């Protein structure tokens, strides 16, 4: 068993060896190394064909037309292109956007930028279970609302939003609907023929593909128009100029094909491991799951261990690669803004750990994790004066702390 045990699949996934193998064939002189836009010789034609195959594989994953797939550098760029692209193209129709407080920073900071440009953004607060009720979204809609952006699966707590219902609502009001599917594409079934989503962001490195490549699904019927953010050779039907990175695109295509084929089996195994982990730690006193228990992705488990400081717990769990929030914000010691939005106080938000399980996690690793967590919590609480007070029946909410 390799230490530390990797339980941070929501931050990134290792590249599947089958994907790496395919990518290796697209780099050197004896492989498919040409520029897909070179139309005058075989090197270009071969690269173009490889990109076409990958585009079809990504489209297949979400049941889209391959012409609706725009390759980007990742879900962050896809989110930026979708939100800014719609806002700028349709601004004469209206300048109001709806999103949620628990979105990824790639959506929140893009919306903040649009606010600086004169757009108005409504940030919806979730219920305590992390979900946003349909009625909340509907009541925020106005005549000048041009876009709703709600993620499919939350990166920190794993809750699943009902994008089918939100899509129906948006379509009935003629409002464009963008979904950040970075955490769900390749893990949950997605069908853009059934779901009325207009724009959908996908990341390759969350589904065992390479980093630095993603895609944006842009609906053709009814047609969604975007203002490009990257200008140049007019690649990707003018929406995203720049020479296509054949090896990364081929990697993403292969990852999508494997994800589609193995999704059911992968999820059944991962759900079993997640349950095994939760059953092994839920007996610890004052331990709580964050986010809805039913409507959640099976690979995600966000747990608060009360009366334990998150950072010291992370250090005690040095054999486990886990995080206390998302990788994109774990550089800051602020408590998770997602957990704060659910109504958790600073202490509970600080004592939470995100475990995310994936394709290469084993039972042996989960059992080792359970043992490590139980030992660590016990020893950290033994050192905690707050735990002692709590066990003595002191109501910590009522304590007046002296400020020095």
From Swiss-Prot:
InterPro entries: Aminotrans_V_dom, Aminotrans_V_PyrdxlP_BS, Cys_deSase_IscS, Cysteine_dSase, PyrdxlP-dep_Trfase, PyrdxlP-dep_Trfase_major, PyrdxlP-dep_Trfase_small. One of its GO terms (molecular function) is cysteine desulfurase activity. One of its GO terms (cellular component) is L-cysteine desulfurase complex. Keywords: 2Fe-2S, Cytoplasm, Iron, Iron-sulfur, Metal-binding, Pyridoxal phosphate, Transferase. The modification N6-(pyridoxal phosphate)lysine is found at residue 206. It is found in: Cytoplasm. Pyridoxal 5'-phosphate binds at residues 75-76, 155, 183, 203-205, 243. Its cofactor is pyridoxal 5'-phosphate. PANTHER family: CYSTEINE DESULFURASE, CYSTEINE DESULFURYLASE FAMILY MEMBER. Belongs to the class-V pyridoxal-phosphate-dependent aminotransferase family. NifS/IscS subfamily. Homodimer. Forms a heterotetramer with IscU, interacts with other sulfur acceptors. This is Cysteine desulfurase IscS. It comes from Shewanella woodyi (strain ATCC 51908 / MS32).
